[in-house]
Amino acid sequence: MDNSTGTGEGCHVDSRVDHLFPPSLYIFVIGVGLPTNCLALWAAYRQVRQHNELGVYLMNLSIADLLYICTLPLWVDYFLHHDNWIHGPGSCKLFGFIFYSNIYISIAFLCCISVDRYLAVAHPLRFARLRRVKTAVAVSSVVWATELGANSAPLFHDELFRDRYNHTFCFEKFPMERWVAWMNLYRVFVGFLFPWALMLLCYRGILRAVQSSVSTERQEKVKIKRLALSLIAIVLVCFAPYHALLLSRSAVYLGRPWDCGFEERVFSAYHSSLAFTSLNCVADPILYCLVNEGARSDVAKALHNLLRFLASNKPQEMANASLTLETPLTSKRSTTGKSSGAVWAVPPTAQGDQVPLKVLLPPAQ
């Protein structure tokens, strides 16, 4: 992220080269991400009501994505006006703060999901207390407080910068300021690389636990591996290009603060990579809702109930429609012994954490 203050000559960046791709991508994310995240939020809420700690992380992830999507219309307008912010300094600070904070909030909650799944698979009994709803709520509160606090510095600085062509940049300055460069390094290493490395370790632990389980069928192992790998892939594909350019820009500035050549060359690529991070808002609900056949069935039922409600205009039908979401993300067992989706079953044992993993599939309808 860049922050700006006042006016000045700055670097010669061509704002006309990126007025099509970022707004087009943002419009796509609004159209797809808004309904899918609303559906994911509803599904996560129902998991929380079933005392599933994973639903807490998914619910917070959906809330963060929805807040981010609410800022996109103004950024579409910003890019269509060739990087010219016309909505005043207050809105620039607020919407820029939400926009950029979401990157690290999303990464943090994806990391929380990876750690939760690792504990559920590799140590289902030893760390059972860490996988409670109360613990998930406490962890989520820490995530929000930490990430919002770490990204709050721009709220105390001017964020509008007018260049020589009378463009008013919001949350951007070319070249950046020195304190911003150091802050960017913190974001790259602490906000991006550290949680991604932790997710890699969790994935490795999940692979070991699954491979050592002789009772787990091959197809079930593939599903578990696919889920863990999908979490890593979302962070890598959506956020790695942006942070690679952010790191490069910050390092070049700290080495040669007077040199605008690099800024001018990567300007378009940097904006494109920033827009690419918005795909996270589409990938998150797809990861949750479409990770396996059982989840796809639940989504289909929810959409069927919604369409029936809209067609009949009878709210009572929607209220009576039930949706049970027990996907392979879930490690909880139903108190009734029944589930409409697939779960990771962990039978009780007195011999440590070496327990067989088994995916229980719902009976054929």
From Swiss-Prot:
GO molecular function terms listed in the Swiss-Prot or TrEMBL record: G protein-coupled receptor activity
Pfam families given in the database record: 7tm_1
Family matches, as InterPro entries: GPCR_Rhodpsn, GPCR_Rhodpsn_7TM, GPR4_orph
Region entry Extracellular loop 2 (ECL2), spans: 159-174
Activity regulation field: Activated by a network of residues that connects an extracellular-facing cavity to Glu-147, a conserved charged residue buried in the transmembrane core of the receptor. Protonation likely drives conformational changes in extracellular loop 2 (ECL2), which stabilizes movement of transmembrane 3 (TM3) and a series of rearrangements that connect the extracellular-facing cavity to Glu-147, a residue only conserved in proton-sensing G-protein coupled receptors.
Result of knocking out the encoding gene: Deficient mice display partial neonatal and postnatal lethality, hemorrhages, impaired association of vascular smooth muscle cells with capillaries and small arteries and veins, and impaired contact between mesangial cells and renal glomerular capillaries. The inflammatory response is reduced in an inflammatory hindlimb ischemia-reperfusion model. Deficient mice display reduced central respiratory chemoreflex, increased apnea frequency, and blunted ventilatory responses to CO2. Decreased net acid secretion by the kidney, resulting in a nongap metabolic acidosis.
Top-level taxonomic group: Eukaryota
Membrane topology according to the record: Multi-pass membrane protein
GO biological process, one term: positive regulation of inflammatory response
Record keyword Translocase present: no
Glycosylation sites: N3, N166
Transmembrane segments: 11-47, 52-82, 88-123, 132-158, 175-212, 217-252, 263-291
Cell location: Cell membrane
Tissue distribution of the protein: Detected in neurons of the brain-stem retrotrapezoid nucleus (RTN). Expressed in the kidney cortex, in the outer and inner medulla and in isolated kidney collecting ducts.
UniProt entry keywords in alphabetical sequence: Cell membrane, Disulfide bond, G-protein coupled receptor, Glycoprotein, Membrane, Receptor, Transducer, Transmembrane, Transmembrane helix
Residues exposed to the Extracellular side: 1-10, 83-87, 159-174, 253-262
UniProt site positions, description: Required for activation: E147
Cystine connections: C11-C260, C92-C170
Impact upon substituting L125A: Decreased proton-induced G-protein coupled receptor activity
CDD domains per the UniProt record, alphabetical: 7tmA_GPR4 (cd15366)
Function field: Proton-sensing G-protein coupled receptor activated by extracellular pH, which is required to monitor pH changes and generate adaptive reactions. Activated by an optimal pH of 6.8-7.2. Ligand binding causes a conformation change that triggers signaling via guanine nucleotide-binding proteins (G proteins) and modulates the activity of downstream effectors, such as adenylate cyclase. GPR4 is mainly coupled to G(s) G proteins and mediates activation of adenylate cyclase activity. May also couple with G(q) and G(12)/G(13) G proteins.
Domain statement: A multitude of proton-sensing residues, which include extracellular histidine residues (His-157, His-167 and His-271) or triad of buried acidic residues (Asp-65, Glu-147 and Asp-284), contribute to activation of the G-protein coupled receptor activity and pH sensitivity.
Protein name per Swiss-Prot or TrEMBL: G-protein coupled receptor 4
